[in-house]
Curated annotation (Swiss-Prot):
Pathway: Amino-acid biosynthesis; L-lysine biosynthesis via DAP pathway; LL-2,6-diaminopimelate from (S)-tetrahydrodipicolinate (succinylase route): step 1/3. Keywords: Acyltransferase, Amino-acid biosynthesis, Cytoplasm, Diaminopimelate biosynthesis, Lysine biosynthesis, Repeat, Transferase. InterPro entries: DapD_Trfase_Hexpep_rpt_fam (IPR005664), Hexapep (IPR001451), Hexapep_transf_CS (IPR018357), THP_succinylTrfase_dom1 (IPR023180), THP_succinylTrfase_N_sf (IPR037133), Trimer_LpxA-like_sf (IPR011004). It is found in: Cytoplasm. GO terms for molecular function: 2,3,4,5-tetrahydropyridine-2,6-dicarboxylate N-succinyltransferase activity; nucleotidyltransferase activity. Substrate binds at R104, D141. It catalyses: (S)-2,3,4,5-tetrahydrodipicolinate + succinyl-CoA + H2O = (S)-2-succinylamino-6-oxoheptanedioate + CoA. Its EC number is 2.3.1.117. HAMAP family: DapD (MF_00811). Transmembrane segments: none annotated. This is 2,3,4,5-tetrahydropyridine-2,6-dicarboxylate N-succinyltransferase. It comes from Psychrobacter arcticus (strain DSM 17307 / VKM B-2377 / 273-4).
Length: 273
């Protein structure tokens, strides 16, 4: 039986499993998947022929992993302890391992085992959950959170306090995806499997879930669940049909190409909106 088949079958029987009853072959399979997610050789979602494909079986392995162990005390230096069932990614790393990985981790940043942090990425005091993929050159700024199985592209900047939703709680079908070269402004939230396409700029305080209307003021088109590539997005509202009230919406105020994005600062793009 293949690794994928073992995970798929185990997921069907997941309610039968506990740390005490988990079969050894299932335990080994889950740990193998977690190790591959941890070193980046496997991803919960990947782009193939221009479309995002979700490896649902890998996500199922992440969900199963919470049945592997009971909570246990995890020490972090002399004065800090955690009580959890998932180990942290860097708990046993040496200086040589950090240098080889090429990542910068600023205390007290935490990444869970089973997340991947690519070379050149910087974790300010932040949190990266299990199954997440943070690609090369990404900046996860202070108090930003990268949810379980979320996919963060190359050179993405997640500003202070940004929340990128996960798939575990509440259970979601697909991970939230931030494609390459995106900027997510402070305190914004992108959740529920929304895809922010390449080069988009999200202003401070924008909240986008699957039901959020994303209104393009140039075309009048309304998107849901996807921010088109190169969009510059700010918070706003749209009027009701009877004109009695307005409801929140994300507003695409302009589109920029890669050349303009490279020559123009994020602040300028938003200020000129």
């Amino acid at each position: 039986m293949s690794l994928q088949q073992t995970i798929e079958q185990a997921f069907e029987n997941r309610n039968e499993y506990s740390p005490a009853t988990m079969p050894q072959d299932v335990r080994d399979a889950i740990n193998q998947v977690l190790e591959q997610l941890d070193n980046g050789t496997l991803r919960v979602a990947e782009k193939k022929d221009g479309e995002w494909v979700v490896n649902q079986w890998a996500k199922k392995a992440v969900l199963l992993s919470f049945r592997l162990n009971d909570n246990y005390v995890q020490a972090a230096g002399e004065h800090i302890q955690f009580y959890d069932k998932v180990p942290t990614k860097f708990a046993d790393w040496t200086e040589a391992q950090f240098k080889e990985a090429g990542v910068r981790v600023v205390p007290p940043a935490v990444a869970r085992k089973g997340s991947y942090i690519a070379p050149g990425a910087v974790l300010m005091p932040s949190y990266v959950n299990i199954g997440a993929y943070v690609d090369q050159g990404a900046m996860v700024d202070t108090w930003a959170t990268v949810g379980s199985c979320a996919q963060i592209g190359k050179n993405v900047h997640l500003s202070g306090g940004v929340g990128i939703g996960g798939v575990l709680e509440p259970l979601q079908a697909n991970p939230t995806i931030i494609e390459d070269n995106c900027f997510i402004g402070a305190r914004s939230e992108i959740v529920e499997g929304v895809i922010v396409e390449e080069g988009a700029v999200i202003s401070m305080g924008v909240y986008i879930g699957q039901s959020t209307r994303i209104y393009d003021r140039e075309t009048g088109e309304i998107h849901r669940g996807r921010v088109p590539a190169g969009s510059v997005v700010v918070p706003g509202s749209l009027p009701s049909e009877d004109g009695t009230h307005s409801l929140y919406a994300a507003i695409i105020v302009k589109k920029v190409d890669a050349q303009t994005r490279a020559k123009t600062s994020v602040n300028e793009l938003l200020r000129l909106a």
